[in-house]
Structure formats: C-alpha cells, structure tokens
Amino acid sequence: MKDLVKFLKAQSKTSEDFDVIKIGLASPDMIRSWSFGEVKKPETINYRTFKPERDGLFCARIFGPVKDYECLCGKYKRLKHRGVICEKCGVEVTQTKVRRERMGHIELASPVAHIWFLKSLPSRIGLLLDMPLRDIERVLYFESYIVIEPGMTDLEKGQLLTEEQFMDAEDRWADEFDAKMGAEAIQALLRDMDLEHECETLREELQETNSETKRKKITKRLKLLEAFMQSGNKPEWMVMTVLPVLPPDLRPLVPLDGGRFATSDLNDLYRRVINRNNRLKRLLDLVAPDIIVRNEKRMLQESVDALLDNGRRGRAITGSNKRPLKSLADMIKGKQGRFRQNLLGKRVDYSGRSVITVGPYLRLHQCGLPKKMALELFRPFIYAKLESRGFASTIKAAKKMVEREDAIVWDILAEVIREHPILLNRAPTLHRLGIQAFEPILIEGKAMQLHPLVCAAFNADFDGDQMAVHVPLTLEAQLEARALMMSTNNVLSPANGDPIIVPSQDVVLGIYYMTREKVNAKGEGMLLQDPREAEKAYRTGRAELHSRVKIRITEYVKNAEGEFEPQTTLTDTTIGRAILWMIAPKGMPYSLFNQTLGKKAISKLINECYRRLGVKASVMFADQIMYTGFAYAARSGSSVGIDDMVIPEKKYEIISAAEAEVAEIQEQFQSGLVTAGERYNKVIDIWATANERVAKAMMENLSTEEVVNREGNLEKQSSFNSIFMMADSGARGSAAQIRQLAGMRGLMARPDGSIIETPITANFREGLNVLQYFISTHGARKGLADTALKTANSGYLTRRLVDVAQDLVIVEDDCGTHEGIVMTPLIEGGDEKVSLRELVLGRVAAEDILKPGTEEVLFPRNTLLDEKVCDILDENSVDSVKVRSVVTCDTDFGVCAKCYGRDLARGHLINQGEAVGVIAAQSIGEPGTQLTMRTFHIGGAASAAAKESSVQVKNSGSIRLTNVKSVTNNEGKLVVTSRNTELTIIDAFGRTKEHYKVPYGAVLNKGDGEAVTAGETVANWDPHTMPVVSEVAGFVKFVDIVDGLTVTRQTDELTGLSSIVVQDVGERATAGKDLRPAIKVVDAQGNDIFIPGVDVLAQYFLPGKAIVTLDDGAEVQVGEPLARIPQESVGTKDITGGLPRVADLFEARKPKEPAILAEITGIVSFGKETKGKRRLVITPVEGEAYEEMIPKWRQLNVFEGEMVERGDVISDGAETPHDILRLRGVHAVTEYIVNEVQEVYRLQGVKINDKHIEVIVRQMLRKGIITKAYDSEFLEGEQVEVARVKIVNRKREAEGKPPVEFERELLGITKASLATESFISAASFQETTRVLTEAAVAGKRDELRGLKENVIVGRLIPAGTGFAYHQNRIKNRGQANVVEEQEVKFSAADEAEIEAEFNMIAEDPAASLAEMLNMADDAE
C-alpha cells in the first residue's frame, strides 16, 4: 500500500517549480518531440464498438488508453501490468488522464504558413521579408511565382512573376534561376535570410536616413530582426512542416443518447486537414498535373488556417448548422475563452445561493444561514465529526445519517458551524467589500439573513436580492476569512477612509426622532440625576422623549496616564439624547450626542468612535445604534399621509407671475426684439426661478411650525411633519423629491438632454393631466435606458483600470526619495472646495513642515500626517504641504509604503504586500455606476450666469497677484495686460481664502498686497469684448488700415457713432491680403514710442473682427483701450460629463479642439499666413525659433510681441494631457488628471481619495521613449519601462558612463495594459492573438510579477498573505537585487502579549479563535 501511495505521488509530480514562462516559435523537431505518434487517418471512433480507430484522431496507441490501466483489446487489465505495452493493440497500460496531455502530430506533405504570423497586423513574415502582405498572399495562395535564386539572370531576388512572365523567363534562361510558388517559396526565402547581415545594413541605413517615416519603418524591422536573433527563434519556423495535434480529451467526442455524437469543432477542423494532406500525398506520389497539386496545396493551406484561426482569412468554415467552427484561437480569446472563463475565475465547490432578508437582531459579525443550506455546505465536516465521535462506522453510514436527517446530525451541525466563518458575496462584486466573512447562525426557513449595516458595502437591499455563500475549507482560509475579511474588520471604506458601516433609513429616522427637541413638551424643565432616571421618567409617562430637561451626565475623559476618569456635569439636554447616551462607549464626549442627529452626524459619531477607541468599540457601538434606532423608529410612528404634503399658498401667484413674464417675452420675440434662441433661454430661466421660489415657499411652510411655549408666547420650532423629518434626517428622500410632491414638478428634459420649455406646474398631490404625464414619461424612459448602458460601460472601465494597475503592490517600506507633490487647498472663486486637511490626511510629509513665517520645524519629513497632526497644521494655519506620492515613488517594480501613506481601510501606515493597484481600480470603478452617462449641453440659461464681469471678495484680507503685468491708468488704477493673471485673497495667517482668474484688460481697484474688506469689488471688466490696451500715452497712428481694403466703416443707427471694423484675411480683396492692420502709438512729433521695460515698439496688430472707435491721430492715455475684440459668445457647448469624461481622462484621449500651448519660452510673432492657417512663431532669447501653423478660426490669447513661457496657453480649449506632460512635466499632468477626475466625482457627491487616481496615473506613466541611447541595449525611439531604464542607468553610473536619456510617455489605460511587460497579463486582457503573436516572435519571458499572471498559472498571488511566500521564493533563488523582507517590528509589550496568547492556545487548543482575534462575545 505504501508503495502505491508513493507511486501515485510520483505520478502527480509535475513541473511545479518554475520562475519564468517563455513563449516562442516551435521548431518542427520540437513538435515531433512532444508527439507520441503520427495521426494518419481522419477517422475518430468506430461507431459500432465506440472504440477509437487506430492511427486516427483518437487513437489509443498514440494518446493512451480509454479506460484506466486497461489496454484496448482487453489483454492486459489491472494495476499489476502497469507500464506494459500490449503487443496486440500497441496501447500502453496506464491512467486515462494521459489522454489530456499526450500530443500527436501530422507530417504535412507541403509546408504551410502560420496564419498568425502572416495576417496578424503588422504581418511578421511581411516585415521580415520586407514585402507587402498582398504579394506574400499571392505567392502563398498560388497566384504568382516568386524568385528565390536569380542566378545569372536580370531577375531580382524576391521579385514576383505571373504565370506568363515565368514561362517567358524559363524560355530565356532555362534553369539558370529558381522561382517557386506556395509556402515552400516563402520558407526558402526565410531560410536564406542572414539576420546579422540584415541588421548591419539596417543600422547603416538608419544612420543615413533623415525621413521620419523611413526611420520608423527601419526601427520596426530592426527590432523584429534583433528579437529573432536574441530569442533563438528561426524565421523559417513561421512556416510549418509539422502540425501538432491537441490531446483528444481536450477536444472530446461524446456519444449522446440516440446514437448521435457531440463533438468539439476542432475534430472537424483536424479531419479536414488530414483528408487534404492525405490526398495531397497521393497526388504527389502519382505525379499529378501541376494545377491539381497546386489546388490541393492551396486547400491544405486554407484548412490549416481555419484550424488555427478560423475566419481570419476569407470566409470562416462553417459546420453543418451554418455557424462558424470554433478554432484554436477562438478557444483562448474573448470572454468565453480559456483566459477569462477558466483561468482568471472559476466556479467553485462548497457554495450556495439564496434570497436575503433582514436580520435586525444579528450582531455585526453574524449572518443567518438556513439549516438546509448549512447541512449541504458542511457535509464533509459533518461526516468527519460523525465518524470521529463514533456515531457512524464508515463514511457511507455517515452519509445515510445525514440523508435521513437524524436528530444527532443537527447537533453535530451546530458544533461544526461554531466559529467557522463563511463568505457572503453579492454580485456584482464591484469592490473588495462585496465579499465579506460572517459567522453563521442557524435559522429556519430558506432565506439567508443579513445584518442591515453591511448593506451599504454590499449595495444590497431586501427587495429580492440574492447572495452567494462560500465555505473556506482549510484552516488557513478560515484564518484569513476571520482576520481579514470579517465584516467587523471592514468598518472603513478603502475608497475614502470614512466608515462604511453607517446606519441608514429606519435607523437614522429613529435616532433623529429620539434626539429632536419639542417646545413645551410634557415634563419640560425637570431636573434628573442621571440618564437611567430620564429613561424611567419616559417609560412611566412623566416626560416625553423630546422634553428639554437638565440631567447630570457623567463623561469619561482620558488622563495623562491614558486611564479613563469620570467627570460629571449638569447639562441642558433632552430625555431622548440622555437615553441614547446610555449606549455610548466610554471615552466619547457628550457634546457629540447633544444635538439633533441626522445621517451625517451619526456617521461622524461612528468615525470619532473609531479614531478614539478603535475597531471593537465602534463595532459594538454601531450595533447598539442600530438596535436603538429600529426600536425608536417604531415608537415614533412616522408615516406618510397625503395631508403631510402641504402645498404653499404662494404657489399660484408665483406661477401666474411667471406666465405673464413668458407672455411678455413671446411678444418681444414676435416683434423681433429677441432671437428665438434668446427667447428659449429666457423662458427656461423664468421657469427655473419660479420653480426655485415655489420650492422655497414650500420648504419654509413644511419645515417650521409655530407653537406656544411655557411662558405662553409664540415660538418657532422645527416641524414634526413625517415627510420633512425623513428628508431632514437623511433617512429617505430629498428636498427635490418633496418639491415634486408638494411644489411643482418643474422643467423636464428630452431624451437628448435639452429642456422642454413648458414646465409641469402641477405636483403629484394635485395630480398630472395627460399632457403633463406624457412629458414626464419622455424623460423617465431616457433614465432607464441610460442606467442599462451605464452599468456595462462602468464595468468595462473598472476592468480596464484593474488591468492596468493589477501588478502594483507595496514591496518595500521606504524608497528614500525626497520628491513629492505640493498640496494646497482647492479654492474656486470665493469657496474652499477641498480643504488642505482632506488632501494631506493619511499622507507622509516629503520635507520638514515649518511653522508659517518662522524656521521652526513643526513635523520632520517622513511623518505620517494623521488626525492629530492635521489639527496642529490647522491651528498653525499651514497652507501648503509637500507630501510623498505614488507618482514620485522610486521603487522599481511596485511602490513603497511611505510614498503611499495610510491604508485607508485600516487607518495606519499601509502594510507591505497590500495590492494598492487593485484597491485603487476598485475605488474608482465602484462608484462608476452612480455617475451620469450624459453629456451636458451648457448653453443659454447656464452660460448666462457664467459670464462674470467683476471680482467681489467674500473675506477680508490682503490681495496677492500672480503672473501679472499691468499699467497704471490716469485714474491711478491698474489695468491688467497679461494673460493668465490670478488674484488670491490671503488672510492674516497667510492662508489662501479665495482664488480668481482675472482676464486681460481688467481694471483693478486695489494693487498687490493691499488690504480689502469683505464684499468689496476689486476688479471689473467687460465680459463681452476683449480690449487692446495701450501701454503708453501718445497719439494714435493707423498702419495698413485702409477703408474698403482691410477695414469697413459701420455707423450705429441709434447713436450715430461710426466705428472701424477690421476684416478677416479671408474676406479681403487680393490687394489687402498681405496688409497687416495695426495701431501705433506715437509721440506728438510722430516718432515711435517704445514700451518701457522691454524694447518693443508700441504697435498693436489688430485681428479680424476687431472694432476701433478712435480716429487716426486721437490722443490716448496709458491703460486706455485702443480697440475692442468681440468675444464670440460660445453657443451651446457639449461638456462631456460623468462616466465618459472619466474614461476619456484615463484613456488620455486628445480632445477635439485642444488648447494650443507654447512649446518654448520666447517672444510671439506671426509669420506669413497660408490659406486657412496662420503661422505662429516663438523666438527664444537664444536658440532656434519655433513655428506652428494654427487654424484661423482659433481665438488666440496672445498678441504680437508678447512674451510667453513654455506651457502657456496660446489658444483656449481643453488641454491635452500629453502636451501638459511634455511641456510642464509629470507633476502638472498628475495634478491635471487628478483634479479633472475628482471634478466629475465631486459633482455626484462621491468621495474618493486622490491617492487612488495617482496610482492609476503612475501606471499610465510607466513607459518612456528613449531619446539618447549611447551604447546601451536600447534603441532610440524605443518604448521602454521607465523602471528598466533606471536600473540600467544605475549600472551605467557605477561604471562612470553617461545615463540613457528618455522622455516620459503618457499612455491611456488600455494601451498601458497591453504594453505591460507580462505577455500573459496582456493576452488575458484584450487582443489576445496580437499579443501572443508579438510575444512568440520576440521569445518573450514572463517573470510572473503581477497578480494576474500568478492567478493564471495557479499560484498564490504576490500580494497579501502570498507576499511573503513569493519573497521567500525569490530569496531562495538567491537573486542579489531582492527587496529584503522587512521584519515586523514588535515592541516588547506586544511580544509578551502575543506569547501569552500563544501559550494559552497551546495549553487549550480548543480555545476559541474568536478570543484570539478580539471577537469575544462580551459585547452583549
């Protein structure tokens, strides 16, 4: 028996231990070495005996026996003949499973080109031979001859000849030359290639050529040739002479009942190949006429093509039922292919699914599991227990007992289940909180019970949702489930670090109702000694829940030693709040409870509890809040009645007033005073404001009521209207929904997003008429269609994000970099959108943080900025901090913990081995379904408000101007003459409070550094035109302003004033094309004036459409406008919002009309114009001038002679991230993408930490283009991983060589995923064929670094608990450049505690895991 076990073990030993997977081309010899015999016949199975035919596709002699340890003819049976080869039927006696691994082969009678290397673009064969694909196909499919060896003739090698040309040539030169057709010809050409010689020639050509396209082509070819040389692949192997045959059990043939067979499509395809191959062999033996042989060869080529990749060339071969057959390539690609269906995720045993219902009495770490399900899921455990306890003698007996459901079985089940966590999962699993572990509680019935507080994480509700259960079987799995996945360990959301276990709906309503106060309630003014007495008073009916009373409250405050000390104060509060206080854990301040608690306040309460007292206290507290909330929501008796929807009286006046206004606009429109567009916009504006007013009146009406207080006076108090309470507490509904119930429904949108101008004036209480109902359905359908599309798109975005970031893991503690990102609060206009605290919380400081205005160091670099640190930063009003970031981390493959900062879901510095890439992808993708799908038409109503014309400050402080050039006009005010001027308001502490952009030509009432008071207007400008400001005083002199040629005169009918309008170049007569209208400012004598400070003439060129109101010779003062350029009011512009915008950003797509940025720093001038474009020239102080052609219709922000900095905006538009990276660097592009993505999420009210977006940006920036290669292994213009270049450069530095220079490249996430170093990961993502073809030709190695590759080869992933395993493997391989496993630092106290724990377990192994993991049940 022992031997048998040993033998079976030896059998199962496979090549487990490998570190790299290499892919390459298979040589014919290699294919033969894999093979166990040649398949000669197309037969499969004998349909009478069901035995495989000899030499056929299922031959037992080649592939192995059909039954375990039994030969085909039945001569040898049983184990004792193991390894014998039967002399009668030739079958080896062994296990059947060899039929899954033994391959066969087919010797092809004529070579066949591999379709992947032929047709997968760019064609590898074509690139290698430097021939167009069309020509190669003509040779392969026997339409032309190709010259292989020209000999002494005039022909060229590789020249194509038609049939006639070939005949002529043969007549002329007889057998001097060699020309063939078909794959043999291509094979011969490939075999004759001298790779090294070709490389040399190409390198020389590369040096000589100047044309960009040619360089690109040569580099491509050179790379391919080098890949062939390095990988040891031979070019002729791209043409096959031997075809491998897949093991038969991987392409099964299954007999169905009724004598029919179900077969894999591959068998049909192989049969076709074998038939044609055999026929070809016979034809060659018979020396058949050329044309027949040729046709047969062509058919063989086509059948092999279909086997490898059906439908890649020509029509796909179809089976009997008209559907294309599934070829080998189809087996591995797509959602149903091998990668995505079987390797990246599989269906598993020990799982079940059922509907979920509420379990309001459960504790947070529990879930209810129906007994029937538990019995089924825990079967093996029950069998084992029954046997070990001696209730059953054999497994079979145990099985019977379980099937009979004996009474003892249920007792055993309860025992087995105790402390055995199970995993619950709700599809779609959008983030890691979609699978959590719970302890099962056995329940009757068939539905599982779920704790209400985890619903938010699962995004579950109880309207029929189903959930799946999985059982972790091994001890390790149970331990992981309990220590990492238990719902009690997932209190915080990984996306933003806020609690995700927060009460919602009923619970919120109950707590809110409890903590409200009521004027003159029963028992008001009582004095009570403690909360217990308050509860007694409430229970006995002496006081109401909402009565205002005085109660002695005892709080526990930590002293210097960290012990809790009681402090008692007499507090004004309400009965309900005192009752709630009884469940508060020690150490929480009463002030947090002494207020009306809505959803936000309760969330804050739990967050505070987590930060002050840790996980255990928070979890218990959350549970208690839930029980209390449910109880008091029931007591409150809130309900919704039709009378609760109170319609304001004012509504009808407001509506009739609006109708009158609309009628007036209509009259103006009919008399031609306003255009159709203006009328539409105004009407919509009127109704929008009317709606707002109705809503305001309604809310005022609903939210307050007047009551008589104890003194007998009237007092206002918050209303106890049920609908209002639900919305106000945050339990359900919103002001917008109440508005539709009791106000007016308002304007509706059409499916394309435009607004219908007739609003719905009715609300739901009054009811809608048919027309109104119809208009409503219009927009509602769009909403449903949107949702369906959105889900798919969001899922695809998540998939791309996960794919690009999957291999990013924390691999070391500190990379030692001093780089970082400077964080400043995000201020738009007068509001602080995001505070500094939110931005830096949980990050690590990149340099010492100084107290503002001093040299005092508040915190040294590498401090983790937690809540306490942030409080101190706020107190000292620090307004910018340089923090470390993933984008600037120096770790080669992975990130270091210090650059990442805090693990948001745990609240401490992140652990090594944490898969931050996947977490980031999930955090960004999960809220994707909440984002809208729509593109917003911002026009009319919205943009009217956007045209600002002044800056009015909201805070007092002092002004700071940045990027400003200005002149002082004769009133002593500053006139701005620079483009992107920014005005910030700084408070007394030096903190930025407000931030505005000030346009060119604005007049400033205050200068830099001056004090302003709140409400003061500091800048004014005309929003509709852009002035051309004179920077000197003098007299106007027109240049090239010729009436009728370059300008036209227009006289205003109302005022009688005439003005000059400059014509566009395109509209001018030919004579005026080269004239450049300008205004010069000269002194009284007519001499030129130079602008002070710069040696530039005071001459202003006028663009087309500019309006000049001054006359020639008029006097101008400094800062006066010489001309005005009307700003075209941009019509309705589509602003892409929501999900598509996020996708565009991560894909780094170029916008339709991108902003034009200055490529270099210098002075702007305009060169000669061409048709439709003007030439922009930037001349730097030294070096070459830069020229760019810009379309005429682009509005430029610069004038001739203006100085621009590299990266300045020359023409407005959406900025291209690639340009930002090129001109302003990595920091700028990171900031741009992070802010733009956050903008979308903020609009939807979704909080995501910047870190996650930075992680994705890091992955988008991981490639670079080599600009100077020197003598390294890289080619110039090659795309390489930045980490690779860094490693090479460190080596070169040590050798004293100059470092390789490269330019960072920004790739979109799809491109970045496909450009990953791991071909396995890329192939399982998209474009499988292309990725594998490329990898095979280059002989790529996959180091199995990422998570995906390891999942595919069936290993632990190099993250989380598998991280140490992988580190050890690497260590054992003895590689020198390994990140050393850092030892976990324990303090002595920790060690003592751990030791005590372990001793306890050693003495009493049955001691509960729960105690060990702090899950003890003393929380009751």
Curated annotation (Swiss-Prot):
One of its GO terms (biological process) is DNA-templated transcription. Disulfide bonds: none annotated. Its cofactor is Mg(2+); Zn(2+). InterPro entries: DNA-dir_RpoC_beta_prime, DNA-dir_RpoC_beta_prime_bact, RNA_pol_asu, RNA_pol_N, RNA_pol_Rpb1_1, RNA_pol_Rpb1_3, RNA_pol_Rpb1_3_sf, RNA_pol_Rpb1_4. The keyword RNA-binding does not apply. It catalyses: RNA(n) + a ribonucleoside 5'-triphosphate = RNA(n+1) + diphosphate. GO terms for cellular component: DNA-directed RNA polymerase complex. Its EC number is 2.7.7.6. It comes from the Bacteria. Mg(2+) binds at residues 461, 463, 465. Zn(2+) 1 binds at residues 71, 73, 86, 89. Pfam families: RNA_pol_Rpb1_1, RNA_pol_Rpb1_2, RNA_pol_Rpb1_3, RNA_pol_Rpb1_4, RNA_pol_Rpb1_5. Binds 1 Mg(2+) ion per subunit. Binds 2 Zn(2+) ions per subunit. Keywords: DNA-directed RNA polymerase, Magnesium, Metal-binding, Nucleotidyltransferase, Transcription, Transferase, Zinc. GO terms for molecular function: DNA binding; DNA-directed RNA polymerase activity; magnesium ion binding; zinc ion binding. Zn(2+) 2 binds at residues 815, 889, 896, 899. Belongs to the RNA polymerase beta' chain family. The RNAP catalytic core consists of 2 alpha, 1 beta, 1 beta' and 1 omega subunit. When a sigma factor is associated with the core the holoenzyme is formed, which can initiate transcription. DNA-dependent RNA polymerase catalyzes the transcription of DNA into RNA using the four ribonucleoside triphosphates as substrates. This is DNA-directed RNA polymerase subunit beta'. The lineage of its organism: Bacteria, Pseudomonadati, Pseudomonadota, Gammaproteobacteria, Pasteurellales.
